[in-house]
From Swiss-Prot:
Gene3D superfamilies: Ribonuclease Inhibitor. It comes from the Eukaryota. The keyword Repeat applies. LRR repeats lie at residues 77-99, 101-126, 127-152, 153-178, 180-205, 206-231, 232-257, 258-301, 302-333. Component of SCF(SKP2B) E3 ubiquitin ligase complexes, which mediate the ubiquitination and subsequent proteasomal degradation of the cyclin-dependent kinase inhibitor KRP1. Does not interact with auxin. Keywords: Leucine-rich repeat, Repeat. Pfam families: F-box, LRR_6. This is F-box protein SKP2B. SUPFAM superfamilies: F-box domain, RNI-like.
């Protein structure tokens, strides 16, 4: 995103060029489209919508030039607003419709699908009123989606979600947190079969999925980097073993309250790190070391784990931290894991030994 300071410099340059070219602005409609869009980049989305109503010239300029819009500020009548705006803003690539209270209905999502065919990033979180009809509409009209947030959407089925994946095959980021009824093993099988570019998936609180679903996901989405299985209470070590073996680029794994997880899962993660060290060395040569290896792991409330198994993971992946301010290895509720420590503690101990405090 271009900074506000850089945009202001561009505006000043535009004004200077207009002076040199003798451009006269006597009415609002005379403002050049390029200048108008630079001005609108400095204001909030509500003002952009108002600007599109000033005159037909501004409406057309905004319609063709606006690629990102958020209506999250709209606390009521969002559905009507979307119905009004969707036919006008046909070049949108990012649309944020996050709600505090559910407002959106199927007809608004259908309008988006009918008009916004270039959409790549869509946030429909907490749209608990939308049903299967919305997902079928998106599958028909928004096949370029790479990022989709459906968290908190509780009124559609796994059949509709599976159908969506067959048409939105470019998805890289998918948030299904809390979509309890829609996320089943069949859903994960469909995602694995159709969305092999997927890199981030949130399945938090989707308590109906089992190892079968996660294994299908692991085999079908080898580029997976972030996976949240928070409170997926049915999964066992088999899921983690499959992820460790198949998803070698995994960076973040959430296993909060997955109480069937044991040491076997931890050792499989550690072994995958050792086995894939050649990938890490390849990244080092490219100057991308920070991008390789597990960097975030949440095993809170996984009470079957022992210190030795978790320490093996921590030793294998030095980006996992237990030290203050850098908690990327989260172990809340696991009192028996208090002895697990990251490399920073050993380094601090060595420093203290080499440079002891002077006597007073």
């Amino acid at each position: 995103m271009v900074s506000e300071g850089a945009t202001r410099k561009e505006l000043n340059l535009c004004f200077e060029n207009m002076k040199m070219e003798g451009v006269l602005i006597s009415e609002w409609k005379d403002i050049p489209v390029e200048l108008l869009m630079k001005i609108l980049n400095l204001v909030d989305d509500r003002t952009v919508i108002i600007a599109s109503c000033i005159c037909s010239g501004w409406r057309d300029a905004v319609s063709l030039g606006l690629t990102r819009l958020s209506l999250s500020w709209c606390k009521k009548n969002m559905n009507s607003l979307v119905l009004s705006l969707a036919p006008k803003f046909v070049k949108l690539q990012t649309l944020v419709l996050r709600q505090d209270k559910p407002q959106l209905e199927d007809n608004a999502v259908e309008a988006i699908a009918n008009h916004c065919h270039e959409l790549q990033d869509l946030d429909l979180s907490k749209s608990s009123k939308i049903t299967d009809h919305s997902l079928y509409s998106l599958a028909r009209g928004c096949t370029n989606l790479t990022k989709l947030n459906l968290s908190g959407c509780t009124s559609f089925s796994d059949t509709a979600l599976a159908h969506l994946t067959r048409f939105c095959r470019k998805l890289k980021i998918l948030n299904l947190c809390g979509c309890v009824e829609a996320v089943s093993d069949n859903t994960l099988q469909a995602i694995g079969e159709n969305c092999n570019q997927l890199q981030s998936l949130n399945l938090g609180w989707c308590e109906n999925i089992s190892d079968d679903g996660v294994m299908s996901l692991a085999y079908g989405c080898p580029d997976l980097r972030t996976l949240d299985l928070c409170s997926c209470v049915l999964i066992t070590d088999e899921s983690v073993v499959a992820l460790a073996n198949r998803c070698i680029h995994l960076r973040s794994l959430g296993l909060y309250y997955c109480r069937n997880i044991t040491d076997r899962a931890m050792y499989s993660l550690a072994q995958s790190g050792v086995k894939n060290k050649h990938e890490m060395w390849r990244a080092v040569k490219k100057g991308k070391f920070d991008e390789e290896g597990l960097r975030s792991l949440n095993i809170s409330q996984c009470t079957y784990l022992t210190p030795s198994a978790v320490q093996a993971v921590c030793d294998t992946f030095p980006a996992l931290h237990t030290c203050s301010g850098r908690h990327s290895l989260v172990m809340s509720g696991c009192l028996n894991l208090q002895s697990v420590h990251c490399a920073c503690i050993l380094q601090a101990h060595r420093t203290h030994t080499v440079y002891p405090h002077p006597a007073h």
